[in-house]
Amino acid sequence: MDYREAGVDIQAGRSFVEKIRQGVESTYRREVLGGLGGFGGYFELPQGYQHPVLVSGTDGVGTKLKIAQALNQHHTIGIDLVAMCVNDVLTCGAEPLFFLDYLATGKLNPQQLSDVVQGIVEGCRLSGCALLGGETAEMPGFYPVGEYDVAGFCVGIVEKSKILDGSQVNIGDIAIGLASSGVHSNGFSLVRKIVEVNGLNWSDRPQLLNGQTLGEVLLTPTQLYVKPILNALNSGLDIHAMAHITGGGLPENLPRCLDKGQSVEIIDKSWNILPIFQWIAQQGQISPASMYETFNMGIGFVVIVPPEKAQLAVNFLENQGILAYEIGKVIEGKGEVVIESND
C-alpha cells in the first residue's frame, strides 16, 4: 500500500501547483522576493514609511461554499475570500500587501480548485496585493466528495501616525455607506434554510430578481473596497474611521470603529436596498431588525467623516465607481446602532 492508495495523490498536487503558477506569479509586486514553491514567502517592506505597522487579518467564506459546490461554480469564491480579508485590513487605513490561502478537500479536483485560485488571483490583482503562497490539503475521508473549504490570510501596512482606531471620531460625524454588490459572504446559513424550508432551487428565477437565477445573484462576489478607499486616503480626504459590514450587519460592525461614549444613528432606507434582501425578508418572513442583524442590507463598507466633508466624500467615492450614500451620523451613546425610520 502507498500514499496514493490511501487517497493522497502527491503527483496530482504537484500538477496543480504548476497549473496555478502563472496566475499566482501575475499578482507579484516588486517587493516579492523569490517564487512559488518555497517553505515560506518573502516580502520586502515598502519604502517611504517612518514607523510602519503591519496589520493582519484572516477569514473564510462560510456556507456560501455550499451554493458554489451545488452549482459547480467556483470562480467567484476566490474573490470572496480575498475581499473578506483585505476589506477588514483596510478599515484601519492599511494597504494590503500580500495574501495567503488555505484550501482543504477530500480528493483533489484540479479544475475545481484552479477555478477557486483563479478567483483568488483576480481578487489580489483588484486589491493590488500579492498572492505570496498557500497550502492545498488533500484529506481523504474528512470532506465529502466534491466539497472543499477555504481560508485566507492578509497582511497590510500603515504608517503608525495614520492608524484609524476610532479615537478620531467625533459626535456629529457623518456615516457614508458604500454599496454592497449583494449578500457578500455572510448570512448564508439562513438563506440556505429559507430555500430548504420553502422547497426552492438555486435555478429558480424569482420575479424580484429581474430574470436572474437565485444562485447567480447569491454567488455575486463580495465587493472589494481597497482601491477607492486607498485613493481617498491618499488624496487627503479626512476620514475618521471605517467599518467593514460583515456578520452581524450594521448593528454589530459599526460600533467597532467608534470611540467610547458614541453610537451611530442610521436612517433606514436612505440607500438602495437590493432586491435580494427584499426576497430574503419575504420568503423567510424575517423582521426588519433581524435582517439588519444578519445581512449587510446593501451597505458593505462605512466611512466616518466630519460633516463638512460628507458631500466631498460622497462625490469622491462615486467618482471612483462605487455608489455612496449619507446613511447616518455619530451621536452620544453606548456603542450601539440606532436605526430610525425614514417614513
Curated annotation (Swiss-Prot):
Pathway: Purine metabolism; IMP biosynthesis via de novo pathway; 5-amino-1-(5-phospho-D-ribosyl)imidazole from N(2)-formyl-N(1)-(5-phospho-D-ribosyl)glycinamide: step 2/2. It is found in: Cytoplasm. It catalyses: 2-formamido-N(1)-(5-O-phospho-beta-D-ribosyl)acetamidine + ATP = 5-amino-1-(5-phospho-beta-D-ribosyl)imidazole + ADP + phosphate + H(+). It comes from the Bacteria. It is an enzyme of class 6 (ligase). Its EC number is 6.3.3.1. It holds the Pfam family AIRS. One of its GO terms (biological process) is adenine biosynthetic process. One of its GO terms (molecular function) is phosphoribosylamine-glycine ligase activity. The keyword Ion transport does not apply. GO terms for cellular component: cytosol. Keywords: ATP-binding, Cytoplasm, Ligase, Nucleotide-binding, Purine biosynthesis. Belongs to the AIR synthase family. NCBIfam families: purM. This is Phosphoribosylformylglycinamidine cyclo-ligase. It comes from Rippkaea orientalis (strain PCC 8801 / RF-1). The lineage of its organism: Bacteria, Bacillati, Cyanobacteriota, Cyanophyceae, Oscillatoriophycideae. The gene is purM.
